[in-house]
Structure formats: C-alpha cells, structure tokens
C-alpha cells in the first residue's frame, strides 16, 4: 500500500501487475492527523511525508467562528455549490506556472532549506543537537511552487521574498526529523523553522528589469478559456 501511494503521489500513476494507469488531472492527496491521539495508527515513513507539499496546522476556531458553526448546524443545511471546475483549476495552475521567479528568490528558498541542515553555518549552533535530519530538496522546490501560487493570489505576476517566507513553516515543519533531545527539551519543528527564517536574510528585489520585462501573464478567465 505504501509503495502504491508513493507512486501515485510522485508519478501520478498506479501500477497493478503489468498494467499502469495514469491518474486524472487535477490530482492531489490530502491526509489528516490527530495531534492528540495516535493509538492504533502507524506513522508514515519520512519518504512519504516528504511528498506532501504542505503541513497545515489547524487549531481551535475563534469564538465568532465557533458561533457561526453552531448557527449553521441549527439551520437548514445549504446545498453545496461548485466553486471552480476541474478545467478552470487546470487553467489557474497554468497561470501560476507562468508567474516569474527571480534567481535570488530561488537561492533564498534553497538557503532556508540549508539552514535546517547546517544551522551552525547560520549562527544557530544551538540547534544542531535538536535536528537529526534537515529538510530535503523538495522543500526548496515546494517553497518556490507555493510562492508562485501565493503571489498570484496576492495579485502579482512575480514572486517576492515574503511569499516564500510566509510559506516556510507549512513547507518545512513536516520535513524535519527531530532528535530525542528536542523531544526531551520540548523543542518543536515550528520553533526551529522560526529561528531558521529569522537567521536567513531575505534578498532585496528591485522592481525593475527583469521584472518589468516579463510579459503579462493571462488572467484566470483567459487561461481557462484557452485550456
């Protein structure tokens, strides 16, 4: 089962015997984890966890959000409506792929990842004993990919350092393998990521060439029409 899921997540295909089946687009894998109780479950191997783009931590809802939940449960359940079609989603993905990424942004993402592997080189000598293994190259890739999507959501055609920085916790937290000393000292992956982000200086990007030289990317509607 694990190898089949690995194949699906990485290669977008499933092999049964001698037959290989391509998975439809768009395709994604979502998993949930109970942070309080894990009895009767088995942890995913690091190789599989690494294939998840983000790990999003969802805490308790705010007071007003919880009141809204209760109100909705007390009323008639509304019918679900389609927010976006598969074709439109593929069009949006194509638009995100066209968002410009400066070489300095790529280097910034790689440097953030490196800070989790060799913290002593970034003035974080105290973190060495808490990290058994730092983040893999997939972390760098996903910070850039996620940065493109976030820049698009923020109404830009180019990625800025804050797009990568804001996604760093979601991309890095599940890719760190902490030592027993970290568990004993109650050091969390999030605290390590926070220190790593603080230790790496974000690049300064001038909004001139080559940013202004980039062709205007199509809007979502135009992309979906051409998809």
Over which residues does each language-model region extend?
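Canonical AAA+ ATPase core
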Residues: 4-99, 148-153
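Generic alpha-helical structural context detector
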Residues: 7, 54, 68-71, 110-114, ...
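A general structural signal marking secondary-structure boundaries and capping sites
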Residues: 12, 73, 77, 116-120, ...
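Alpha-helix N-cap and coil->helix boundary residues
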Residues: 44, 65, 84, 100, ...
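A broadly tuned preference for mixed-charge, low-complexity surface segments
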Residues: 46, 86-88, 108, 113, ...
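AAA+ P-loop NTPase domains with strong preference for DNA replication initiators
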Residues: 71-159
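C-terminal engagement/docking regions of AAA+ P-loop ATPases
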Residues: 121-227
